[in-house]
Amino acid sequence: MQLATIFLGFIVFGFSENIKGPAIPRIQFDFMLNESQLGTLLSLNALGYLIACSFTAFLTRLWGIKIVSIAAFGVMILSGVFIYLSNSFPMFSSSYFLMYIGNGMLEIALAILGARIFVKNTGTMMNLTHGFYGLSSTVAPLIATGLMSVSVFGHMLDWRGMYVAMLSLSILPILFALRSSFPSDEVAHEDRVPMKTLMRDRVLWFMVLILSFGVVSELAVGGWLVNFLEKAYKWEGVKASGMLSAFFLCFTLARLILGPITDKIGFILSLIIFSGFSALCTFGAIIGGEPLAFLFAAAGIGIAMIYPTVMAFIAKRYPNGTDTAITFTVTLMGVGSVIGNYLIGGVIELVKNGVGSDTQIGLIRGLQTGYGFIGLCAAICAVFSFILYLILKKQKELI
């Protein structure tokens, strides 16, 4: 039951994160948003995610992991209803913000639960469970595209109906969680590593930087790839969503198959190799143009490994402070997500206006530059991983 809750939790998490790709162009059209406003919207929602990350570990110690997990799924169902009812941009923004509160709570809860359960073969099991996120992410864009064109009793679902339908799937892990018994926190209060001690460890700060740049590069694909392909290359929505699904297929297969490699060659070396590969694929796709667009999908192989590998590293390095270390790292990662999404939208708008705001070439150059920033984040992730590798090798603390 514990594993079923984790696996279903990551499936729902993947749906909620990645149905936005096909929906964003429609949302943008309905509310008449430019790229800068769209970036701001995604940043504000990342802020909701950040806020949730900051209090979820505290609630876990107060209420227990079971209640917090159920509450996270409940918030996501509620947000779906509010998104469906939203008829103005402020109401939609608030509803979307609430969904990211649920996402943040769920991410911390699943990470803590995984760290408590998977004490052996940590890298393999973390990647396996996160692989279920990839599975749902693979089909999410195609399902979202299909649902938006479905009519129920003569009424088109559109993006509002699609959101409420997909987020209602959260009821499934709730049912499993209600019947499950979850491991309690067995670390005594006096044995727990204090936050101040963790904050003095520069290795944890490197993890924050690596995770922040890696996750911005990962999550930005779900928000911007379909938009990029539809506007820059004039792809149809189904074809563009298919490329996003191909990205997540590569993403999923990498997590399901390559997890044991991280345990074998080491977590930090894995971070260097995989983030570097993702950066090369992204830059290659942009420079090569439409004929090399398949490299956008191939980039998923590399970026998929960053988050679970960082979680595995934290679980191994801080066995008596895993909850605190995860919360600290993921919360600051949320700050990076807010800034990253805002910068992507801002860069696109800035370059587009500089080249020609009303021209096709201006839009293409803006989107290329914005997507180039996504590749740059993966490259920076690789650089920080390499620096950390040198530090830990010198201290003989490589994991």
Predicted regions: what they are:
Residues 51-90:
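Conserved MFS/SLC helix-loop-helix module at the cytosolic interface between two early adjacent transmembrane helices
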Residues 2-27, 31, 221-226, 340:
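Extracytoplasmic
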Residues 95-131:
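Cytoplasmic helix-loop-helix junction between adjacent transmembrane helices
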Residues 32, 64, 85-90, 119, ...:
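Helix-breaking motifs and short loop linkers at transmembrane-helix boundaries and internal kinks
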